[in-house]
């Protein structure tokens, strides 16, 4: 698993580095979406997650939910547009799960994307994510996850 400054970035995911979001194809035409370890470390302990509801549309580049920590409130922006088909209710009930386990238990929503093939070229594969994330962390002045 690639790691940048102590932040794990699993190689089986696709990344929107600019927005600190990961995507995992589910094999049924849907994609699971979550925040990277970098995002959760930068935000601090999450205290609230308000997702778009099941059945709601998400426009590409827009929010699939709002996250809040003690020092930050903001959108989780999805590079893909589509319909929310599943919400992580466990994360709604206990948002800090994303801090402890951003890639398994701490996912945000599952989306049925409208045009996934057009989004793929903009995402970075896990095998290639180290250099872009190193540059992103430099530009944001983030020392790392540890």
Q: Where are the regions that the model predicts?
A:
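Generic structural motif
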Residues: 20, 55, 78-86
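Short, conserved beta-turn/loop elements at beta-strand boundaries and strand-helix junctions
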Residues: 25-28, 86-93
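Short, solvent-exposed secondary-structure boundary/capping segments
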Residues: 92-100
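Short hydrophobic beta/alpha edge segments that flank linear recognition/processing sites
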Residues: 58-74, 99, 106-112
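Short, charged/polar surface micro-motifs in flexible loops or helix N-caps
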Residues: 40-41, 81-84, 90-91
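Ligand-binding loop in jelly-roll beta-barrel domains
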Residues: 79, 102-104
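Conserved strand-loop elements at the edges of beta-sheets that form or border functional pockets
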Residues: 25, 69, 78
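Acidic, low-complexity mobile loops and tails
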Residues: 1-60, 105-115, 122-130, 134-146
